Curated annotation (Swiss-Prot):
GO terms for cellular component: cortical endoplasmic reticulum; endoplasmic reticulum membrane; perinuclear endoplasmic reticulum
Organism: Aspergillus clavatus (strain ATCC 1007 / CBS 513.65 / DSM 816 / NCTC 3887 / NRRL 1 / QM 1276 / 107)
Any coiled-coil regions, as ranges: none
Domain of life of the native organism: Eukaryota
Protein encoded by which gene: cho2
Compartment(s): Endoplasmic reticulum membrane
InterPro entries from the UniProt entry: Phopholipid_MeTrfase, Phosphatid-EA_MeTrfase_fun
Protein name per its UniProtKB record: Phosphatidylethanolamine N-methyltransferase
């Protein structure tokens, strides 16, 4: 409900970002950028009403009638009422009567539980329904299975009374442009879903207000002035919240308000207007300001804490439900660029920023570095716990120095002298972080001083860039580490949390710290590693600016929101010294933006810089004319002042020494869950009517080169074990390629359950042959379509219920059989080596009717003895089919030739790169990070990297055919 969404074209941005992201071809549509005019009445130039058309996933086009918001439907006398409206109003009335009838001591706990129930129904209940509808089309499939929208006249609807009730309810609400019988099932399902949403949302809000009433009171010894200020601030926040909701509904209408794009899309242009231009996710961010206004008016910490809990739950709903659906629906990966001929491949490769494989490894000149003008690909990032690498000097020194800082902080006494030292240390690091780093960047912008220094000693610009990232990274972390240490020294644990505003100060301070963390994460997501480290000071990037994420709303989010945490520390500590550090930090940050970033951006991008961000434009439109003129005068005054200070600094700018390094990130341990979940299954009572001989599974796949015979002749076995296997009529072992699709042919009785399913398991997972006691973890396919609410379980069905006459049975039985085929591929496979089996299960349960022959998934190791590893061509030929399997053989992802670049989805979904690096490790014994696969971008480049890595590591590898010591070359 936080965004308006529609199909059609989207409005172009003004072009915005304070630091450009490297190698960004285009700005992807983001949730906050997507708003739709909805299904409200539109008019063309002649004043004639325009229809809104919807489109179902199946391609059906229909007219979307006009609907109204839930409050108008329920409370407006002009709107027609139906039975569901009466039910909702009655339930709301029960809530109000309950508040009136409960004893005083029970009101608060009872309504706290009631509100938490409705909030869980909203975020968990509706979230679960929408998640399943988005991924599996569950709600529509429920409607199809129950046939509640099928006309009873056909004789196929088992619920004719329910059909008439729903028909009357919906047609009462939509008197025009709507026919219940002719509307698509997706639209009718959405309308029924809306009524459930109306009930939950209304009860959620009303129960919250009643809980606030139950908790409300006036603090002891509160003066009249404080009471007036508290109520005034609360009313302002509530009115602001009301405006946000009304303006958001004006923009998105009912279609997006009720998550209509989970069911169908509308053919209409996207707009970017109103509150959606002010803040990201306005319905879930500033749209909850009223909760805190009500908390102020109630003067209750209980209401405040339950408001924070509800707000956090709403953000979880956004992250886990809405954003994944928006990305899937509106931000699909762009179509891949296919190569036309070998010449174009070569030309494209030379222009790429990915590592390029030379024609021969011997042609490389180790002492003649290449000075590429473009930025290097981001493979080994610095930021984030997931990127912590103790083999890297930057990370190791960060952890050691950080540990030292906090050890000194904890072990030293909090005397005035030590407090002074810690505050002075924090101030020095802040000055270095803003002034020192600013001076380095200014010289780099004007004279390329940093890069020139490294080129002077024969290094490349890429090496200068890497060293700069380490310097900036350590300076940043040391700045904040020293600030946290100073806060620790100045903080005194409260003796009484209930005294005065102590608790409120801590809550607000924690909120501001959280805001700064969110702002930093948003900035990093928008800019990437390149923009975060000011990459356009070091490399010539594209002259076009793109604005997305938080930069859609703010030109410099670090100017205010990026320092919210330091002011949160001021609130928590109530210390004058920390207030001084906060003022110093804010002043230096503003100066850095004005004197370092702004001149460089103007020089680099000129007039393409956007003057006003989305929030600024919205505020200017809302201001009266006198205030607009005052705003312009204030801006001019600040500009003149900054120009004067800049001229003064230019005349006497000190040279600051390069600083100390630190950055601490806690190591994260990866815990692998046991890949199976134990379940309790019950044997079906109707199994007696089925003969297990009628069930069978036959497996077919792409054969892999088996190493079994090689292992037998290795000399490690006894004499008898070295002899060839005497199979005595048994079939050859099944060994399939890693990641190749596996076809399963099944047979079952003609009267088999339509909910039968086939699952893929490790042989060692199940000890029982009668019941599968382990979850398939999504690796299963139904035998028949339309039997499950989950549409993904039908992906892979080839044929179903093809009759095999009894005359064609090999076992001589006289009964006809049903047969079918399914194909397991992609996420339905195990992406590892091992021995596996398929199991045929009965009637949606875990009773096993048949088990396939066990088969092995094996990655053939590259034979370095027969084929020289230094030959990239042979490596390419061995690697190419494996890479295609890792990419699911999807034509939009998998390459058709070794030179063709990978599809863009490889960049977005990390599982594909992880599959490839696992295969490379097994084939060649070389371990790469997944980012290497993304950076190389083709089999050709990856093969060259493997050869180069093998050559580098060769002196440390034990060869198969000789000693590890060097040998003389043969003449």
């Amino acid at each position: 409900m936080d965004r308006g969404l529609s199909t059609g074209t989207h409005q172009e941005d003004d072009g915005l970002r304070e630091r450009i992201v490297a190698s960004q071809s285009g700005a992807a549509l983001t949730p906050e950028a997507l708003t739709a005019t909805g299904e409200g009445l539109l008019k063309d130039k002649t004043g004639k009403e325009m229809k809104t058309y919807g489109r179902t996933p199946g391609g059906t086009v229909f007219t979307v009638p006009q609907t109204h918001d839930m409050v108008s439907q329920l409370l407006s006398p002009s709107e027609p009422k139906n039975l569901s409206d009466v039910a909702v109003i009655a339930i709301l009335g029960v809530h109000i009567l309950l508040l009136w009838g409960l004893p005083a001591g029970a009101k608060v706990p009872v309504f706290a539980l009631i509100y938490l129930f409705w909030r869980a129904a909203y975020n968990a209940g509706i979230g679960w329904l929408l998640h399943n509808q988005s991924n599996y089309n569950t709600l529509v499939r429920w409607a199809e299975k129950t046939k509640i929208f099928v006309n009873p006249a056909t004789g196929k609807n088992p619920h004719p009374n329910l059909y008439q009730l729903i028909k009357r309810e919906l047609e009462t609400k939509i008197p025009t442009d709507y026919s219940f019988e002719n509307a698509p099932i997706e639209y009718n399902t959405w309308l029924v879903f809306r009524r459930l949403v109306d009930l939950i949302l209304m009860c959620d809000f009303v129960s919250y207000c009643l809980f606030a009433v139950a908790c409300s009171g006036r603090p002891v010894d509160e003066g009249a002035l404080m009471t007036v200020l508290r109520w005034s601030a609360g009313i302002v926040l509530v009115l602001f919240n009301l405006w946000v909701k009304l303006d958001a509904h004006r923009v998105v209408k009912d279609y997006a308000w009720y998550w209509g794009d989970f069911f169908f899309l509308i053919d209409q242009e996207l707009t970017f207007d109103g509150v959606f231009e002010m803040a990201p996710h306005p319905m879930y961010s500033v749209g909850y300001a009223g909760y805190y206004g009500i908390s102020l008016m109630a003067a209750s910490y209980k209401v405040l804490f339950i408001s924070i809990l509800a707000h956090a739950a709403q953000f979880a709903f956004l992250v886990f439900v809405e954003n994944p659906h928006i990305d899937k629906t509106y931000n699909p990966p762009p179509p891949r660029k296919r190569t036309i001929d070998q010449e174009s491949v070569s030309a494209a490769s030379q222009a790429s920023s990915s590592p390029i494989a030379p024609a021969s490894l011997d042609e490389q000149l180790p002492h003649a570095p290449s000075y590429a003008s473009g930025p290097p690909p981001s493979v080994h990032n610095l930021l984030g716990i997931q990127n912590l690498d103790l083999h890297r000097i930057t990370d190791t020194s960060s952890m050691l120095i950080q540990f030292l800082v906090f050890a000194i902080t904890v072990l030293t006494p909090s005397t005035p002298w030590y407090r002074f030292l810690f505050v002075a240390n924090a101030a020095i690091w802040r000055i270095w972080y803003s002034v020192g780093i600013g001076l380095v960047l200014d010289r780099q912008s004007n004279r390329k001083a940093w890069t020139r220094h490294f080129v002077k000693y024969g290094e490349t610009p890429q090496e200068a860039w890497n060293q700069w990232k380490g310097t900036y990274h350590l300076s940043m972390v040391m700045c904040y580490a020293s600030f946290i240490a100073a806060v620790w020294k100045m903080y005194t644990f409260p003796a009484d949390w209930g005294y005065g505003l102590v608790l409120l100060r801590h809550v607000l301070g924690a909120g501001l710290i959280s805001l700064q963390i969110w702002t930093s994460v948003s900035i990093y997501e928008s800019l990437g590693e390149f923009g975060w480290f000011y990459g356009d000071f070091f490399f010539d990037a594209s002259p076009k600016l793109t604005y997305n994420g938080i930069y859609r709303f703010l030109n410099n989010p670090e100017r205010v929101l990026g320092l919210a945490g330091v002011w949160g520390a001021v609130l928590i500590t109530s210390s004058g010294a920390i207030t001084f550090l906060a003022l110093l930090s804010h002043t230096l940050t503003l100066a850095f933006i004005q004197f370092v970033e702004r001149p460089h951006m103007q020089k680099l991008y000129g007039r393409s810089l956007r003057r006003d961000a989305g929030l600024t434009k919205s505020l200017k439109r809302s201001l009266p004319d006198p205030l607009k003129q005052l705003h312009g005068s204030v801006d001019k005054m600040f500009d003149d002042s900054f120009e004067f200070i800049e001229d003064l600094i230019d005349t006497a700018r000190p040279k600051l020494a390069a600083g100390v390094n630190t950055f601490v990130k806690d190591t994260s341990a990866l815990f692998q869950k046991y890949p199976a979940r134990v379940t309790i299954s019950r044997i079906d009572e109707d199994l007696a009517g089925y003969d297990s001989r009628d069930y069978s599974l036959e497996v077919e796949g792409t054969d892999s080169l088996s190493l079994h015979d090689v292992d037998q002749s290795s000399g490690r076995e006894g004499l008898n074990a070295r002899m060839p296997l005497d199979r005595r009529g048994d079939l050859k072992n099944l060994v399939f390629e890693y990641g190749s699709p596996i076809k399963v042919k099944w047979t079952a009785p003609l009267n088999h359950s339509k909910k039968d399913w086939i699952g893929l398991y490790r042989v060692i997972d199940n000890t029982s042959r009668e019941i599968s006691r382990v979850s398939s973890q999504g690796r299963w396919i139904a035998t028949n379509e339309g039997s499950y609410d989950n549409s993904k379980c039908e992906q892979g069905i080839v044929t179903s219920d093809v009759v095999i006459p009894a005359s064609q049975r090999k076992d001589g039985e006289g009964r006809d059989l049903a047969s079918g085929e399914v194909v397991f591929s992609g996420d339905k496979l195990f992406w590892t080596q091992g021995v596996f089996e398929f199991r045929y299960h009965h009637n949606g349960k875990h009773n096993v009717m048949s088990i396939s022959r066990p088969f092995e998934i094996r990655i053939s190791r590259f034979d370095e003895d027969e084929i020289p590893l230094m030959d990239p061509t042979s490596v390419e030929m061995s690697l190419f089919p494996v890479v295609r399997n890792c990419f699911d053989r999807d034509p939009e992802i998998a390459p058709e030739t070794v030179d063709e670049p990978f599809g863009s989805l490889v960049e977005r979904d990390g599982k594909y790169a992880k599959r490839v690096v696992f295969a490379v490790h097994q084939m060649f014994g070389i371990e790469f990070a997944p980012e290497v696969v993304k950076a190389d971008g083709s089999v050709h480049n990856l093969a060259w990297r493997i050869c180069n890595a093998k050559r580098v590591l060769a002196p440390y590898s034990m060869p198969k055919n000789g000693a590890a010591t060097p040998t003389e070359a043969k003449e």
